[in-house]
Design a protein with these regions (language model features):
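An N-terminal assembly and electron-transfer interface module characteristic of large anaerobic redox
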Residues: 1-186
Length: 186
């Protein structure tokens, strides 16, 4: 049985609910992978039988905790993200089996380096150009991540698993687009 963080009672009801939902999932044998940035191929996480959870900074609340480890002039998004990890106040980070990030900026690279001391953190190398070499590099990164998931969870991810996950994520994207289209209505 997993424990809740020591500071659980000080959380808002919404944050407590998030913790309880994640704890229930983990207590039932569920797998959770925390992700930073939309470049992480969540389809592979789903194909591995895990739930991808988006991690980010939702408030300035934990920035002061992060500034004990990061420069104060660093991006507030990075400081808040790292602060949530340090303070055990994000249910999705707390219950993630491991974290996946990417190299969109130097600040995130440093954050992931430090974050690896808190929880295993896998960093995907994001190409910085849009040519054939970059595409080849990204394809290799995706295959390395595929292998990481298989090794970490002791599973085999098949092409069929990936195809099913792609269909699921595409259906989700279509629904989000439909929702956003509602904003055009009078």
């Amino acid at each position: 049985m997993l424990r809740l963080p020591d500071n659980f009672e000080s959380f808002t009801d919404a944050r407590k609910a998030g913790f309880m939902k994640m704890k229930e999932h983990k207590d039932n044998g569920g797998k959770i992978v925390g992700t930073y940035c939309s470049f992480v191929p969540t389809e592979l996480i789903i194909a591995a039988g895990a739930i991808p959870v988006s991690l980010c900074a939702t408030s300035e609340e934990p920035i002061s905790a992060a500034e004990a480890h990061l420069p104060s002039n660093l991006c507030p998004l990075i400081k808040a993200s790292y602060g949530f990890a340090l303070t055990d106040t994000c249910p999705y980070f707390y219950f993630s089996d491991f974290i996946v990030g990417e190299t969109t900026c130097d600040g995130k690279k440093k954050m992931f380096e430090l974050m690896n001391d808190l929880k295993e953190t896998y960093v995907m190398q994001l190409p910085s150009s849009r040519d054939e070499v970059a595409l080849d590099m990204w394809e290799k990164e995706i295959h390395k991540f595929w292998k990481k998931l298989e090794d970490f969870y002791g599973v085999t991810i098949t092409e069929e698993d990936v195809k099913k996950a792609i269909l699921l994520k595409n259906a989700e994207r279509d629904l989000v687009l439909e929702y956003l289209e509602l904003g055009k209505l009078n």
